Regions:
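Long hydrophobic segments that form regular secondary structure
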Residues: 187-213, 218, 264-270
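An acidic-aromatic substrate-binding cleft motif
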Residues: 1, 5, 9
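Extended hydrophobic/aromatic segments used for targeting, binding, or gating
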Residues: 30-45, 242-255, 273
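Functionally critical loop-and-helix segments that line ligand-binding/catalytic clefts
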Residues: 1, 181-183, 229
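Acidic/polar loop patches that form or flank catalytic/metal-binding clefts of enzymes
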Residues: 7-8, 119-126, 152-154, 218-230, ...
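Catalytic cores of secreted or luminal carbohydrate-active enzymes
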Residues: 204-253
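Carbohydrate-binding surface patches
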Residues: 254-273
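Aromatic- and carboxylate-enriched substrate-binding clefts and catalytic-loop regions
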Residues: 10-198
């Protein structure tokens, strides 16, 4: 499908009780599970012309992550990774250090700077709202830093959410909103665990997000079989650019609607969402 990379989560030791938030040392960022063959996966991906993106979920244990940071980045370089998605789900450890505290702001910057030393790109989730530092650290390509698509499976986002974010969250930098959900019936996932739950979205809305939610890193967040059901819509995801020469906000009423047109870099191709 021409995708540049695949993100693999859950590869490393520590996921058995990662939401307990009781350990000072939770994950190992250099120890894959026995059934995860790092070198074989990289070989296969390289054969297909696809990169594998690393995932570092910290379970909000930022201090433990910092202790392992250099070893984690060395592991990435030694095994052919050049991009990482970081995660900070849960209450911050050490205690009393909150996601938006000075300590954590310094941590996010420290991770970006050390990643740059190893020529590694960073996409940080559950991080503080950005303030333009992606221009200081261009390897800090994107951040989540607001309720993204994943919250559609956890009670849902307000329907006006994505008409407000371009005027609030996105003022500070690119957002990895993780759009691309084609199956809105949540009972389809997790063996029907979320029975009778429906995501507050539509197929057209999911496609529009690739234009309205600016990020030079975009994700196709659904299962492959759901994309196979809507080949024409999936073609838009494959065609839409992530790097733009021109952006025009044609009309908007925060909380009601927004229309954005962008011209793909080096072309006369316009995309409207």
């Amino acid at each position: 499908n021409g995708f540049d990379a695949v993100l693999v989560e859950g590869w490393n030791e520590g996921w058995e009780d990662w939401t307990a938030y009781t350990k000072n040392r939770q994950f190992s960022f250099t120890s894959p599970y026995p059934d995860f063959d790092v070198d074989e996966l990289q070989r296969y991906a390289h054969e297909k012309g696809v990169r594998v993106m690393m995932h570092h979920e910290t379970s909000a244990n930022a201090a433990d992550y910092e202790r392992q940071l250099d070893d984690a980045f060395k592991f990435m370089v030694n095994h052919g990774y050049n991009a990482v998605k970081t995660g900070y789900v849960g209450p911050i450890i050490p205690r009393c250090e909150y996601h938006a505290s000075q300590w954590m702001n310094n941590h996010y910057i420290h991770v970006a700077k050390r990643a740059a030393d190893f020529n590694i790109m960073v996409n940080s989730h559950e991080a503080v709202r950005p303030t333009g530092l992606c221009r200081t650290y261009p390897n800090w390509l994107a951040q989540e830093s607001a309720r993204g698509t994943e919250f559609e499976s956890m009670g849902g986002n307000p329907v006006d959410h994505t008409t407000i974010l371009p005027f609030t969250r996105l003022m500070g930098g690119p957002m990895d909103y993780t759009p691309g959900i084609f199956q809105g019936d949540l009972s389809y996932y997790e063996n029907g665990y979320k029975k009778d739950q429906q995501a507050r979205t539509t197929l057209a809305r999911q496609l529009a997000l690739y234009c309205t939610m600016y990020s030079p890193l975009q994700m196709a967040a659904d299962l492959p079989e759901n994309y196979e059901r809507f080949i024409d819509a999936f073609q838009f995801i494959k065609d839409v650019a992530v790097d733009w020469d021109e952006s025009r906000y044609l009309e908007a009423e925060p909380g009601d609607y927004i229309t954005v047109a962008r011209r793909a870099k080096g072309t006369n191709n316009w995309f409207v969402g």
